[in-house]
């Protein structure tokens, strides 16, 4: 019989046998290991909770993981939109070819009286049917493209968390939890916060241009607060550009009036909500929304610069 190495004398020196009583109750054997195990389990639970929180925050779009995943979604959706746009263009080309052929046949039939009326009528009906089918296909693709663009743009606005703040009278709107810069009170912000807010606005506008298949004139990144006038000018110009393309402002909009009424942050918010911005018109086009004119307005509306 083998004796316990703790409560009895082991017959074999190099074989350590421990009985059930000592395993369950001897502090000299397992108390320390049990304590280490409990501590390890507690640490594992804490790490598990931390990992779950990080994943939940990340997939919600508030962390680095969420931002990368959303960038990937936007990239994939952009590829789909480009392919859809190519299909749309091909359909348009087909419709145009059918129309050209139809017009050519009409011209031939009008100049050559020897063509039989029955044959001419049949060809005309066939061409009209083909043109109608191609036109219906073109309309379907246009609707699909528009629907996908609207859905993707809505996701973009939710991603950047563009909100209207009723608690702050100075900065009425926020982006990614930061105050959205404006001409009227932008100088009151800390320089680092101002630059971060401008960067978020620039990223938002760049992605919006890509979704709506427009091309921005300038992609120069905002790096610091030294070129604050140029930064404001570029952001306002891009915002006006996409607002006009989306028909959310009048084509002959007065840039002075719209900046006084809405400022940059209000224009961005209305864009995110797809709301029309009412303003006075510059019917004579005496002050067109060029970079130079916008820059002069920016300088006049920020006296501290």
From Swiss-Prot:
Family according to the record: Belongs to the ATG14 family.
Assembly: Component of the autophagy-specific VPS34 PI3-kinase complex I.
Role, per record: Required for cytoplasm to vacuole transport (Cvt) and autophagy as a part of the autophagy-specific VPS34 PI3-kinase complex I. This complex is essential to recruit the ATG8-phosphatidylinositol conjugate and the ATG12-ATG5 conjugate to the pre-autophagosomal structure. ATG14 mediates the specific binding of the VPS34 PI3-kinase complex I to the preautophagosomal structure (PAS).
Cellular location(s): Preautophagosomal structure membrane; Vacuole membrane
Name of the protein this chain belongs to: Autophagy-related protein 14
Entry remark concerning the domains of this protein: Coiled-Coils at the N-terminal half are essential for autophagy.
Topology of this chain in the membrane: Peripheral membrane protein
GO biological process entries: macroautophagy; protein transport
TM helices/strands, residue ranges: none
Main localisation: membrane
KO phenotype (gene knockout): Still forms preautophagosomal structures (PAS) in proximity to the vacuolar membrane.
Keywords: Autophagy, Coiled coil, Membrane, Protein transport, Transport, Vacuole
Note, other: Kluyveromyces marxianus proteins are shorter in length and have a more ordered secondary structure than their S.cerevisiae counterparts, which might contribute to the superior thermotolerance and solubility. K.marxianus could be therefore useful as a new model organism for further elucidation of the molecular details of autophagy.
Listed GO CC annotations: phagophore assembly site membrane; protein-containing complex; vacuolar membrane
Organism encoding this protein: Kluyveromyces marxianus (strain DMKU3-1042 / BCC 29191 / NBRC 104275) (Yeast)
Coiled coil: 34-147
Superkingdom, natural source: Eukaryota
């Amino acid at each position: 019989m083998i004796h316990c190495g703790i409560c009895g004398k082991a017959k074999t020196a190099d074989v350590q046998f421990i009985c059930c009583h000592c395993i369950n109750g001897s502090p000299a054997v397992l108390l320390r290991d049990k304590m280490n195990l409990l501590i390890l389990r507690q640490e594992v639970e804490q790490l598990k909770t931390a990992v779950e929180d990080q994943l939940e925050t990340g997939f919600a779009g508030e962390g680095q993981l969420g931002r990368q995943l959303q960038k990937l979604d936007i990239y994939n959706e952009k590829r789909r939109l480009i392919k859809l746009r190519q299909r749309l263009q091909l359909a348009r080309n087909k419709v145009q070819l059918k129309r050209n052929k139809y017009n050519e046949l009409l011209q031939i039939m009008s100049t050559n009286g020897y063509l039989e009326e029955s044959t001419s009528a049949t060809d005309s009906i066939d061409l009209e049917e083909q043109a109608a089918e191609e036109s219906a296909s073109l309309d379907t693709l246009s609707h699909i493209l528009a629907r996908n663009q609207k859905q993707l743009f809505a996701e973009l606005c939710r991603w950047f968390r563009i909100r209207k703040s009723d608690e702050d009278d100075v900065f009425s709107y926020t982006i990614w939890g930061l105050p959205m810069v404006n001409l009227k009170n932008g100088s009151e912000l800390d320089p680092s916060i101002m630059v971060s807010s401008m960067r978020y606005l620039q990223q938002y506008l760049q992605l919006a241009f890509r979704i709506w298949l427009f091309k921005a004139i300038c992609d120069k990144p905002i790096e610091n607060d030294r070129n604050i006038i140029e930064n404001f000018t570029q952001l306002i110009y891009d915002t006006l550009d996409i607002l006009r393309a989306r028909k959310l402002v009048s084509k002959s909009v007065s840039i002075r009036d719209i900046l006084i009424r809405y400022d940059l942050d209000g224009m961005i918010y209305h864009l995110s909500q797809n709301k029309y911005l009412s303003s006075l018109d510059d019917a004579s086009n005496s002050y067109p929304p060029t970079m130079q004119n916008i820059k002069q307005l920016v300088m006049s509306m920020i006296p501290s610069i």
